[in-house]
UniProtKB/Swiss-Prot annotation:
GO terms for molecular function: cysteine-type peptidase activity; nucleotide binding; RNA binding; RNA-directed RNA polymerase activity. GO terms for cellular component: viral capsid. Residues 633-678 are annotated as: Disordered. The record marks 108-109, 606-607 as: Cleavage. Its EC number is 3.4.22.44, 2.7.7.48. This is Genome polyprotein. GO terms for biological process: DNA-templated transcription; proteolysis; viral RNA genome replication. It catalyses: RNA(n) + a ribonucleoside 5'-triphosphate = RNA(n+1) + diphosphate; Hydrolyzes glutaminyl bonds, and activity is further restricted by preferences for the amino acids in P6 - P1' that vary with the species of potyvirus, e.g. Glu-Xaa-Xaa-Tyr-Xaa-Gln-|-(Ser or Gly) for the enzyme from tobacco etch virus. The natural substrate is the viral polyprotein, but other proteins and oligopeptides containing the appropriate consensus sequence are also cleaved. Keywords: Capsid protein, Hydrolase, Nucleotide-binding, Nucleotidyltransferase, Protease, RNA-directed RNA polymerase, Thiol protease, Transferase, Viral RNA replication, Virion. PROSITE patterns: POTYVIRUS_NIA_PRO, RDRP_SSRNA_POS. It comes from the Viruses.
């Protein structure tokens, strides 16, 4: 018998009790002594209190109601949505946090707590403060003086000065924007059948663009993922500094360890604490005056690193296939990408640039669940990858974020601007919304609509006939509002040059459509200064010059301004012809590319206008073959659009046809309980497509950094071509040759031997010792090591040597020293198996390796090389995870992923008990599971 009290203000969330519990009691029923009724279920254990989930009237009503399966199944994790306001441990022993998380106390003195209600749930506390440091240091005085001193430019430029200003960084602006997440989630507004049809149509659109079911792979190569990280970004809310500050001195092993721990944390339902910061950027003056500044929520490294393993491949395929479907994510603003976009949208007479607002925060769990469903549909079949995706997207929609006053709150809706696939996910949400609106229009009798659309994040551009224009302008706002997205479709134009898409206008220049920023935005690049560094100033002026192409007067202004600076810096702008080649032919000379390096940052405005640098890099790679470029140019400028692929941008409504040859019908491929009827129409045979010509390449361009390019001659490049050396001489995993020689000399002296005697008689025994016992410095505690002489004969003898001399001079580490003997160790192990006296490395048994032929890769100083098989790599990764201290996760061999095996089994078993189907298990999972059970039977300890 115990007293029960509610925990927190919400009596329907958790209650406290004092009944003694043990591990395994979670889920046990709480029974009232008075009437023997079940009043709740034990849920959590605490230090002095235990907690149970109460039986509420809402639960009783739900159990008594007739329920139906959702048409689009719910994919979010059942275990991660609610953290119940309790203290989160958050793996502080596994990541380099500098801030701690504290439990909430009864009284909270801060700003955020007063806003916590339906939209936010307080979870915990940490240290934080509002950053008021802006990336904009002020106006560029040289440009202001130039304008003021010029009678020619002063009346033209002065009205454009100040139209964009640095965003306001203050507490009022912070809460004005962050509270956009504090909106109720409306129920019953979505037409379920139309929504199901929309999701199926988007899947078909992606399939027609080249996506294949099961064709998206998880990537657990930590090196590839690390190379894709933005190292200039911050580590996260609970860390200090940028990623590059932490990783600059990190070894490969430390980077791999962090990746494995991050992936394991996502698998184990671990929550990260995300940043919620004000965005330092240029914004329209009227928004700055209204104190409207955008916030962004970014993922911490302990979530981001592992999350990229399961989202990057889909994202890269999505970028690669831009314009094969109704999206432009990944489009190149040079090389006539926008010309192809413009001409593909010139089928009907009206253009509508839809204006969306508060898109990220308006995304509901329903929409994000649909995005998750689409990703799972195309992901390779594996329960572990599925588990990671489910947990990740549950965390994205129900994010724990650190507010400016130190309160950690959990939101319950909206996408995060700093997660690894924000733009792709937002684009998918908008595609679903457009397909949903089309289905709603069809159900309302609008059968003759003809239209195309393209999306990029929250940017939407529609090309429609007269009837479709009327429906879009009169009905689409309300249709999309049913999904809680806010769009205005009032502005319609009969020329594509009137619309604005991704903060750019379409301009016809020499018969080619090019993207153009507004003039005042180009002036803002010159007006505002991010850095006083000469190279940064040059990059800003160059960026303005590139963006101004097409505005002859603006180009003249920038060139005159650059000439005024030539006495200090000399001439640094490319010629008009070189910039024209960049836009119209996709060709840039090395001098132009060198100038463009570092331009990206100064071209970014509030609507995610595409920067320059990435596009230039892509264009340079494709520019190796002039003939191929000529063919591409001829294709994209011909009178007729290239042969169509079925992409779904066109939403005309003829009768449904059969699916393409070789592809299975997909009417039942999304869900198990699909509905019948004529609501779902086959996008594949309705649409004409947009095909981006990819030039074939006969040669590959060579990228060099700007400074190196200054001295890049044919003779200099031949030096690189002729460079051939032993990789061991430069590989940082090995000790230097001098360190190896010093170790041999010091070890020989310490054991009272000559160097020759040490190498001939003692070193072979030491190699065998390290094979069996590893190179760990923990071995020094033993005081001695054993060597066997005359092995395999009647005179076999065990000899003890002092171990301290072997380690005292081992710099930088014993493992780095012994890597010089990696090949010898492999030979010794192989020969030992042939002779029937196998040398078994300690890591071989500890990691549960089953294949005897892989024993050499369980040796901790054997180095991986290009001849290794996939099995060898798998074994070495598996041994590495077991070697790193503090990790309780296991590596699934094929995926190189650290998992807490027992917790995963428990979660899967619990799901089966709840009626879920038996999980699919990869061969790697079964192998590791079998080895674990075998160790238990044999009594082998971890």
């Amino acid at each position: 018998e115990t007293e029960i009290t509610p925990y927190g203000e919400n009596e329907e969330l958790l209650w406290r009790h004092r009944i003694t519990t043990e591990v395994g009691d979670c889920g046990a029923t709480m029974v009232a002594l008075s009437d023997q009724k079940i009043v709740g279920f034990h849920s959590l254990g605490g230090i002095s209190m235990n907690y149970f989930v109460p039986v509420t009237q809402e639960l009783l009503d739900f159990l008594n109601s007739k329920t139906e399966k959702p048409l689009v199944p719910w994919r979010f994790s059942e275990d991660q949505v609610d953290v119940g306001g309790l203290y989160i441990h958050n793996d502080f022993d596994k990541f380099p946090f500098v801030k701690t998380i504290q439990k909430l106390v009864g009284f909270q003195n801060g700003h955020m707590i007063k806003y916590c209600g339906e939209g936010f749930t307080p979870v915990a506390r940490s240290e934080n403060r509002l950053s008021r440091q802006h990336v904009i240091s002020g106006q560029r005085e040289s440009f202001i003086h130039f304008v003021e001193a010029s009678a020619k430019w002063r009346p033209i430029v002065t009205p454009m000065l100040g139209r964009l200003q640095p965003s306001a960084l203050n507490r009022e602006a912070y809460y004005k924007d962050v509270l956009k997440y504090d909106k109720p989630i409306r129920l019953g507004t979505v037409h379920e059948e139309a929504f199901q049809s929309a999701v199926i149509n988007v899947i078909r659109i992606l399939e027609n663009a080249g996506f294949e079911r099961g064709g998206v792979k998880a990537c657990f190569d930590y090196g590839k993922i690390f190379n894709d990280l933005n190292l200039d970004a911050a580590m996260g809310a609970l860390y200090a500094g940028k990623k590059k500050d932490y990783f600059v001195e990190a070894t490969d092993e430390e980077i791999e360890e962090m990746f494995l721990r991050s992936a394991g944390k996502i698998c184990a339902n671990g929550h990260g604490v995300w940043s919620a910061l004000l965005k330092a950027e240029l914004r329209p003056a009227e928004k700055v005056a209204a104190n409207k500044t955008r916030t962004f929520t970014s993922a911490p490294i302990d979530i981001l690193f592992g999350a990229k393993a399961v989202v990057d491949d889909f994202n890269k395929q999505f970028y690669k296939r831009h314009l094969l479907g109704p999206w432009t994510v990944g489009i190149n603003k040079f090389n006539k990408g926008w010309d192809l976009l413009a001409r593909s949208l010139m089928r009907y007479e009206w253009f509508i640039d839809a204006d969306g607002s508060q898109f990220d925060s308006s995304i509901t769990p329903l929409l994000m669940n649909a995005v998750l469903t689409i990703r799972l549909y195309f992901m390779e079949r594996d329960d572990i990858t599925e588990l990671m995706l489910r947990n990740l997207y549950t965390q994205i929609i129900s994010t724990c974020m650190l507010a400016e006053d130190g309160l950690i709150v959990q939101k319950h809706r909206g996408n995060n601007s700093g997660q690894p696939s924000t733009v792709v996910d937002n684009t998918l949400c908008l595609m679903i919304a457009m397909e949903y609106a089309r289905q709603r229009a069809i159900s309302d009798g609008h059968l003759n609509m003809q239209m195309r659309y393209v999306c990029n994040g929250d940017d939407l551009l529609i090309n429609a006939n007269e009837e479709a224009k009327e429906v879009v302008q009169n009905k689409y706002e309300q249709y999309i509002k049913e999904l809680e997205l806010n769009y205005c479709f009032d502005d319609a134009f009969q020329s594509i040059e009137g619309v604005e898409f991704m903060s750019h206008k379409f301009m016809l220049r020499n018969g080619i459509y090019i993207p153009k920023l507004a003039r005042h935005r180009i002036v803002a690049i010159l007006e505002w200064q991010r850095s006083a560094e000469p190279q940064a100033i040059k990059s800003a002026i160059l960026a303005a010059c590139v963006e101004a192409f097409g505005y002859d007067d603006s180009t003249e202004l920038i060139r005159e301004y650059a000439i005024s600076l030539e006495p200090v810096w000399g001439s640094f702008l490319p010629t008009d012809g070189e910039i024209e080649q960049l836009y119209l032919e996709g060709i840039a000379k090395q001098e132009v590319a060198r100038c463009l390096a570092g331009v990206d940052d100064v071209c970014k405005f509030e609507s995610a206008a595409p920067g320059t640098n990435e596009a230039v890099d892509e264009m340079l790679k494709a520019a190796g073959d002039d003939e191929a470029l000529a063919r591409a140019n001829a294709t994209s400028t011909s009178d007729t659009i290239p042969p169509a692929r079925n992409v779904g941008a066109d939403t005309t409504t003829p009768a449904k046809a059969n699916p393409p040859s070789g592809r299975r019908p997909s009417s039942r491929s999304l869900i198990d309980n699909s509905i019948g009827g004529n609501g779902v129409q086959d996008v594949a045979d309705r649409t004409s497509g947009i095909v981006f010509p990819v030039p074939t390449r006969k040669s590959t361009s060579l990228y060099l950094t700007p400074k190196v390019k200054l001295r890049a001659t044919t003779e200099e490049l031949r030096k690189y071509e002729s460079t051939s050396l032993n990789p061991q001489q430069i590989d940082l995993r090995y000790s230097t040759q001098q360190e190896l020689n010093d170790w041999i000399k010091a070890s020989a002296d310490g054991l009272g031997q000559t160097e020759e005697a040490f190498i001939d008689n003692i070193l072979p025994g030491w190699i065998v010792h390290c094979i069996v016992n590893t190179t760990s410095s923990e071995n020094r505690k033993a005081g001695s090591w054993r060597c066997v002489t005359n092995a395999g004969t009647a005179d076999e003898e065990q000899v003890l040597y002092d171990i301290e001399p072997m380690y005292s001079a081992a710099n930088p580490t014993m493992r780095a020293i012994m890597r010089h003997f990696s090949d010898l160790a492999g030979l010794v192990i192989a020969e030992s198996f042939k002779q029937g006296r196998p040398l078994i490395p300690k890591g071989y048994i500890k990691a549960g390796v089953l294949d005897a032929s892989s024993a050499a890769r369980a040796c901790d100083f054997v180095v991986r090389d290009r001849h290794d098989t996939a099995t060898f790599v798998q074994v070495q990764n598996q041994v590495l995870v077991n070697r790193v201290s503090g990790i309780t996760n296991w590596l699934f061999a094929q995926q190189c992923l650290a998992l807490v095996l027992t917790r995963t089994w428990r979660a899967m078993t619990l799901r089966c008990r709840r009626g879920h189907p038996q999980p699919r298990l990869s061969a790697s999972f079964l192998e590791v599971s079998t080895s674990c059970r075998a160790r238990r039977r044999l009594g082998v300890q971890r």
